[in-house]
């Protein structure tokens, strides 16, 4: 029996106005090529870097949220390698004194250990086409945080879930959009395969995976590939692999570098950055409620375990729910049900995100409250949702259209008698124990009330009138 051992290196683009070591704008996505550059990020002679305080603070927020140990000073190093989109021929990164060591992230019933977090600058972007390579250096020098896990992950599904959890965490902290589509969350995976109980196998790295699906597919293929090699009695070679989306296969890029190949040495143009303990405590106090804390609170409010998990790790839904709950207009579980089913379904159908609509927490809470109190039927409530999504007041809609549930038993009994008289065969079938025939009678009454009666009440009154049950 073989098992996989997986570790991740996650690169997160930090949400700052300017780059890591210069004043160029950091919002490179969609900009004209090579318009967000200066002598510092182009590596021109004599240009000196200056650390971005906001980027450092963002890194501290993540380190503290994960429970990592933060040193009293940060030291930056030069990581030397040659590639066309790295204009300085070195990357300013961190080596032996990173931003954080240790810590962990909850994943189900266990925790994935964090090895280290460090700050660094991003490289530019190469575009290969028609025998040429074009360079866009807008991204060069953008602030990144790299998070490295211990090899605690066992399956491709766990790796994908870990990345989704990290994305939710940094979005909750407000330090990164972490959008894979915009290149703001990228992952390298390290994977080896071994027989259960044996020492770790030879590690293979798969580089530059830019979607959760790609991470899962690349790992699935690579685990199969390594397992087949071991079953043939051969040895896996240490290498750096790429992933081809179309075929779903990994392919060798180059022999994997060792640490010494990068010739790390302290960045001579940057003195150590002190991290005073009072600054660290100030950052700690500013941390918001973290997703796993939010999940525990939702469960304490009576929200089902799986629903609480999905809501807590979907920041837009969590923010919405947290504004709706204090209003006291609907129960927590009912709000959760509507958000995860009806609202999510309508958003998917329209290709919208929640924040792109005019749906307010109060509007949804009022609509759900109308249904919970029995003032409108489920069918009516769901029919009003598209208009409430556009900012309409559900209570006003119900008033104006006369959509309130018909709860007057006297009026309903008259309609029940009419239905029985109009459908004598169905009524007789119910009397003879064929309860399924009751549905036709219920439907007749519901049509008379334009769907505004409670089906359970109509059923009870019909059974009473027919002398059944």
From Swiss-Prot:
EC number: 6.3.5.-
UniProt key word Iron-sulfur: no
Metal-binding among keywords: no
GO molecular function, one term: asparaginyl-tRNA synthase (glutamine-hydrolyzing) activity
Source taxon at top rank: Bacteria
Enzyme class: ligase
Gene3D superfamilies assigned: 1.10.10.410
Annotated catalysed reactions: L-glutamyl-tRNA(Gln) + L-glutamine + ATP + H2O = L-glutaminyl-tRNA(Gln) + L-glutamate + ADP + phosphate + H(+); L-aspartyl-tRNA(Asn) + L-glutamine + ATP + H2O = L-asparaginyl-tRNA(Asn) + L-glutamate + ADP + phosphate + 2 H(+)
Example of a GO biological process term: glutaminyl-tRNAGln biosynthesis via transamidation
Record key words, sorted: ATP-binding, Ligase, Nucleotide-binding, Protein biosynthesis
Complexes and interactors: Heterotrimer of A, B and C subunits.
NCBIfam families for the chain: gatB, PRK05477.1-2, PRK05477.1-4
Function: Allows the formation of correctly charged Asn-tRNA(Asn) or Gln-tRNA(Gln) through the transamidation of misacylated Asp-tRNA(Asn) or Glu-tRNA(Gln) in organisms which lack either or both of asparaginyl-tRNA or glutaminyl-tRNA synthetases. The reaction takes place in the presence of glutamine and ATP through an activated phospho-Asp-tRNA(Asn) or phospho-Glu-tRNA(Gln).
PANTHER family documented for this protein: GLUTAMYL-TRNA GLN AMIDOTRANSFERASE SUBUNIT B MITOCHONDRIAL AND PROKARYOTIC PET112-RELATED, GLUTAMYL-TRNA(GLN) AMIDOTRANSFERASE SUBUNIT B, MITOCHONDRIAL
Similarity comment: Belongs to the GatB/GatE family. GatB subfamily.
Name this protein carries in UniProt: Aspartyl/glutamyl-tRNA(Asn/Gln) amidotransferase subunit B
Organism this protein belongs to: Thermus thermophilus (strain ATCC 27634 / DSM 579 / HB8)
Gene: gatB
């Amino acid at each position: 029996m073989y098992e996989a051992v997986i570790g991740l290196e996650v690169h997160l683009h930090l949400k700052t106005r300017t780059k890591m070591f210069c004043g160029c704008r950091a919002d490179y996505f969609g900009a004209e090529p090579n318009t967000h550059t200066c002598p510092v990020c182009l590596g021109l002679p004599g240009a000196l870097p200056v650390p971005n305080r906001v980027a450092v603070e963002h890194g501290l927020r993540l380190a503290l949220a994960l429970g990592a140990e933060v040193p009293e000073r940060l030291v930056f190093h030069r990581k030397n390698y040659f590639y066309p989109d790295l204009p300085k021929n070195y990357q300013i990164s961190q080596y032996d004194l990173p931003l954080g060591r240790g810590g962990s992230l909850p994943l189900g019933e266990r925790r994935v250990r964090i090895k280290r977090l460090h700050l660094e600058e991003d490289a530019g972007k190469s575009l290969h086409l028609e025998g040429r390579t074009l360079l866009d250096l807008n991204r060069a020098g953008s602030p990144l945080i790299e998070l490295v896990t211990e090899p605690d992950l066992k399956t491709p599904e766990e790796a994908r879930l870990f990345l989704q959890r990290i994305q939710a965490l940094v979005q909750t902290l407000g330090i990164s959009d972490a959008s894979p589509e915009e290149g703001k969350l990228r992952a390298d995976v390290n994977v080896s395969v071994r027989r259960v109980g044996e020492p770790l196998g030879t590690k293979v790295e798969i580089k530059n995976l830019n979607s959760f699906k790609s991470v899962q597919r690349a790992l699935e293929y690579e685990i199969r590939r390594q397992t087949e090699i071991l079953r043939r009695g051969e040895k896996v070679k240490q290498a750096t692999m790429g992933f081809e989306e179309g075929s779903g296969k990994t392919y060798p890029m180059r022999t994997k570098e060792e640490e010494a190949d990068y010739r790390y040495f302290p960045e001579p143009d940057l003195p150590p950055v002190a991290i005073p303990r009072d600054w660290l405590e100030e950052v700690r106090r500013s941390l918001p409620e973290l997703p796993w804390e939010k999940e525990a609170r939702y469960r304490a409010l009576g929200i089902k375990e799986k629903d609480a998990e999905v809501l807590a790790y979907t920041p837009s839904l969590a923010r919405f729910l947290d504004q709706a709950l204090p209003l006291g207009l609907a129960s927590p579980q009912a709000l959760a049900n509507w958000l995860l089913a009806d609202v999510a379904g309508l958003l998917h159908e329209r290709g919208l995100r929640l924040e792109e609509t005019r749906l307010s927490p109060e509007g949804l809470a009022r609509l759900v409250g109308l249904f919970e109190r029995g003032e409108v039927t489920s069918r009516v409530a769901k029919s009003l949702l598209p208009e409430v999504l556009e900012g309409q007041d559900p209570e006003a809609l119900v008033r104006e259209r006369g959509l309130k549930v018909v709860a007057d038993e006297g009026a309903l009994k008259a309609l029940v008698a009419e239905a029985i008289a109009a459908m004598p065969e169905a009524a007789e079938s119910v009397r003879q124990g064929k309860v399924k025939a009751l549905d036709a009678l219920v439907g007749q009454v519901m049509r008379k009330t334009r769907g505004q009666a409670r089906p359970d009440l109509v059923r009870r009154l019909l059974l009473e009138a027919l002398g059944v049950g």
